[in-house]
Design a protein with these regions (language model features):
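Conserved RNA-binding domains used in RNP assembly and mRNA/RNA metabolism
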Residues: 1-84
Length: 84
């Protein structure tokens, strides 16, 4: 299965780039798995929640997401180099 890597805009206006997997869940439970999410800040990518945890996978509720989009090719390339 190919990785689905997207730019994610959260309701707090934080922009992430991450592999994302939709998970079947009960109403109110987290239903998206973010794998190796990174915060996009101008031209810098920083692992999400870097100062708080060593985890690289996070569960999030889709109601915390405003929109999901395909990353520009240069951003995708930068992200892939960073995580590999």
């Amino acid at each position: 299965m190919d990785k689905v890597i997207k730019v994610i805009l959260l309701i707090n206006n934080e922009r992430l780039i991450s592999e994302i997997v939709e998970i079947g869940a009960d109403v109110g439970e987290p239903d998206c798995r973010l794998i190796k999410p990174h915060v996009i800040c101008e031209s810098t990518l920083t692992p999400w929640m870097l100062n708080d945890t060593n985890q690289t996978e996070f569960m999030i509720s889709s109601d915390k997401i405003i929109t999901i989009a395909d990353p520009k090719p240069d951003l995708l390339e930068k992200y892939l180099k960073k995580i590999n």
